[in-house]
UniProtKB/Swiss-Prot annotation:
Its main location: endoplasmic reticulum. This is DnaJ homolog subfamily C member 3. It comes from Rattus norvegicus. InterPro entries: DnaJ_C3_Co-chaperones, DnaJ_domain, J_dom_sf, TPR-like_helical_dom_sf, TPR_rpt. The lineage of its organism: Eukaryota, Metazoa, Chordata, Craniata, Vertebrata. The J domain mediates interaction with HSPA8. Binding to misfolded proteins is mediated by a hydrophobic patch forming a large groove within the first two TPR repeats. Residues 1-31 form the signal peptide. It comes from the Eukaryota. Involved in the unfolded protein response (UPR) during ER stress. Co-chaperone of HSPA8/HSC70, it stimulates its ATPase activity. May inhibit both the autophosphorylation of EIF2AK2/PKR and the ability of EIF2AK2 to catalyze phosphorylation of the EIF2A. May inhibit EIF2AK3/PERK activity. SMART domains: DnaJ, TPR.
Length: 504
């Protein structure tokens, strides 16, 4: 329920001199009110004063039905319509009041206000002039004179706006239209004209705002819905485009342009929806294929190409295809350097490629655009840890595998290197010492990378075998002397080393 105070405020805004309720010089005997109608009028007045607009409206409907020639009933119903923001419904009631009582200056003045807001300037001027000729009160005369001057000024500005539009001076036309629409707020044609100016000036979202207003101000405005749908489509907002073109077809299911556009946007919407569902399911290769279909389905609107590449960039990054991800993410970032999603996805790809400086740069650029994004903050911290780690021991490099290598690849690389660097393969003490160190690193790399939890820690920038990075500072079994490793490997060649070395 609307609060009474709110209603009174609204009434005051729509009726400067007001009507709530003019009763009183016009009531009773002069109107010839019968008992039932008078009851409805009185009850409606009380409900209106209490802010119960819907109930008040019902009473005034009943009064009009009971006495179709009662101008007070129409006038009070117009009051409620205006308080409810229904100016279109109020206007016929005010016109009926004037037909029934030509000297009712309050109704004529109020109708002039509504006509002025609708941009019907000649009709508004006619009402204001008639008020001035009808022996108005001092306040009514002052108000009518003021509004007449305003209507004349709007006529002049309208002519200037049209001249500017015809001369393709859209900036000037917008300036004039801005001023007019502050007064003629319900003029659908002027809003549509300003929307055209905004389109010409490359401001589609402002055009959409005016066209949405025009679609409400003018009945069955299929053209406005069609234009809104086209603008959303060009902006890449396929879902809103589909919604608006459906509104057009609700009004006219045979509208040729709306139907043709509906088929196109529906097809595109389905493709994009399917692609996003595949991404949610982790089916990145299939999602990439879908977005390639999107680009083929709509090659003429650049926004869909950019958005599709942005999502393909994401798919490649998540699917651990860093080379492909970096390439297409970079294409997006050439067009949109501040695209946070592309920056994050390329940064992740750089991490896989062990390009830590580049990853840090991308995360920092993304953070400038969205400093509160936890994913960016965590990614940046990880990249910084990995950079620091890369300057120490890198288990992936030791085994010669990529960061996204599978366990089978890790074991295979480990076996090959363990055989190659087994100390028994070397004769001189210097070579053996070098092999010992290499062999220990290889064993450590295998230990870390074949254990999921240890590998996760290492991938996050923490060396699980480095005592300095462990809480509590415990000893590190892989940072011991070679003597402690004797007995580790099963290779035995009669040399000084005896190992038990198990390939897992």
């Amino acid at each position: 329920m609307v609060a009474p105070g709110s209603v009174r405020s609204r009434l005051g805004a729509v009726f400067p001199f007001l009507l709530v309720l003019v009763d009183l010089q016009y009531e009773g005997a002069e109107c010839g009110v019968n008992a039932d109608v008078e009851k409805h009028l009185e009850l409606g007045k009380k409900l209106l004063a209490a802010g119960q607009l819907a109930d008040a409206l019902s009473q005034f409907h009943a009064a009009v039905d009971g006495d179709p020639d009662n101008y007070i009933a129409y006038y009070r119903r117009a009051t409620v319509f205006l308080a409810m923001g229904k100016s279109k419904a109020a206007l016929p009631d005010l016109t009926r009041v004037i037909e029934l009582k030509m000297d009712f200056t309050a109704a004529r003045l109020q109708r002039g206000h509504l006509l002025l807001k609708q941009g019907r300037l000649a009709e508004a001027e006619d009402d204001f002039k008639k008020v001035l000729k009808s022996n108005p009160s001092e306040n009514e005369e002052k108000e009518a004179q003021s509004q007449l001057v305003k209507a004349d000024e709007m006529q002049r500005l309208r002519a200037q706006a049209l001249d500017a539009f015809d001369s393709a001076d859209y900036t000037a036309a917008i300036t004039f239209l801005d001023e007019i629409l502050e007064v003629c707020v319900w003029d659908a044609e002027l809003r549509e004209l300003r929307a055209e100016c905004f389109i010409k000036e490359g401001e589609p979202r402002k055009a959409i705002s005016d066209l949405k207003a025009a679609s409400k101000l003018k009945n069955d405005n299929t053209e406005a819905f069609y234009k809104i749908s086209i603008l959303y489509y060009q902006l890449g907002d396929h879902e809103l485009s589909l919604s608006e073109v459906r509104e057009c077809l609700k009004l006219d299911q045979d509208h040729k342009r709306c139907f043709a556009h509906y088929k196109q946007v529906k097809k595109l919407n389905k493709l994009i929806g399917s692609a996003e569902e595949l991404i949610r399911d982790g089916r990145y290769t299939d999602a990439t294929s879908k977005y390639e279909s999107v680009m083929k389905a709509e090659p003429s609107v650049a926004e869909y190409t950019v958005r599709s590449k942005e999502r393909i960039c994401h798919c490649f990054s998540k699917d651990e295809k860093p080379v492909e991800a970096i390439k297409i993410c970079s294409e997006v970032l050439q067009l949109e350097p501040d695209n946070v999603n592309a920056l994050k996805d390329r940064a992740e790809a750089y991490l896989i490629e062990e390009m830590y400086d580049e990853a840090i740069q991308d995360y920092e650029a993304a953070q400038e655009q969205n400093e509160n994004d936890q994913q960016i903050r965590e990614g940046l911290e990880k990249a910084q840890r990995l950079l620091k780690q890369s300057q120490k021991r890198d288990y992936y490099k030791i085994l010669g595998v990529k960061r996204n290598a599978k366990k089978q690849e890790i074991i295979k690389a480990y076996r090959k290197l363990a055989l190659q660097w087994h100390p028994d393969n070397f004769q001189s003490e210097e070579e053996k010492k070098k092999a010992e160190k290499k062999f220990i690193d290889i064993a450590a790399a295998k230990e870390v990378l074949s254990d999921p939890e240890m590998r996760r820690k290492f991938d996050d920038g923490e060396d699980p075998l480095d005592a300095e990075t462990q809480q509590g500072g415990g000893s590190n079994p892989f940072h011991r002397s070679w003597d402690s490793w004797q007995g580790f490997n099963p290779f035995s060649s009669g040399g000084p080393f005896r190992f038990k070395f198990h390939f897992n």
